[in-house]
Regions:
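Glycine-rich phosphate/pyrophosphate-handling loop used in enzymes and phosphotransfer proteins
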Residues: 1-217
Length: 217
């Protein structure tokens, strides 16, 4: 899987002379953004304990928000790197599909981004991860306003910020009696997933599940 990821990055024309995580030299063009030592750390690391998330029946996490995985997520988001987002999706694909087969959701979706973020990046990174994983999804959410990034916000500030997540009016009828899986990149305080789950349940969804690429420590 690691070699596949490296080849995908190279195939996309994305290759640097130094590893963007540790700065070590990259000797092979197949390595793309990361040295071999760092790529070896790109493996699932499920938390030993899952804290309860309000309105969410169950959820899964691929790994910890640290090291190479954290760098990959940040690079995909803030380097506006759609190919890297899709490549990361391919890495997590087997684990995401395993969970999908277990819960058998009727509908899979992910958070929306506001217009400011969309125009600065040119894409929604979680949508591109799902495309990379080969997972069909429906755009259920939108985000209003021009708020900045949520990283570094306090819990109270996050609770206010997540109010900008709304449902798309045209899909509300699709949610009634549906089992919904929400995919997101990082689980931190749980404010975002709680808001999204509450929204879909409020219009008749039967159950909400979640999958996160990483969980913050």
């Amino acid at each position: 899987m690691i070699k596949v990821f490296a080849r995908l990055v190279k195939f996309s024309g994305l290759c640097e002379e130094e590893c963007i995580f540790c700065g070590a030299p990259i000797y092979s063009e197949d390595q793309g953004y990361f040295c071999n030592a760092c790529l070896e750390h790109l493996k699932p690391h499920h938390p030993l304990e899952y804290r309860k998330l309000e309105y969410v029946s169950s959820y899964r996490v691929f790994g910890r928000y640290e090291g190479v995985l954290k760098s990959l997520i940040l690079s995909a988001k803030f380097r506006a790197n759609v190919s890297l987002a899709r490549s990361l999706g391919k890495v997590i694909s087997p684990y995401l599909w395993e969970y999908i087969e277990i819960i058998n959701p009727d509908l899979i979706t992910c958070p929306g981004v506001n217009i400011r973020r969309y125009w600065s990046r040119g894409f929604n990174h979680t949508e591109e991860m799902l495309r990379g994983a080969g997972v069909p999804f429906v755009k259920v959410f939108k985000r209003i306003g021009l708020g900045g990034i949520s990283a570094g916000l306090s819990k109270e500030e996050r609770l206010r910020a997540v109010k900008s997540h709304k449902l798309r009016e045209e899909v509300i009828d699709l949610l009634e009696d549906k089992k919904v899986l929400i995919f997101d990149d990082v689980l931190t305080t749980g404010a975002t997933i709680t808001r999204l789950a509450e929204l879909v349940l409020s219009v008749g969804a039967s159950e909400v599940y979640a999958f996160f690429v990483a969980q913050a420590l």
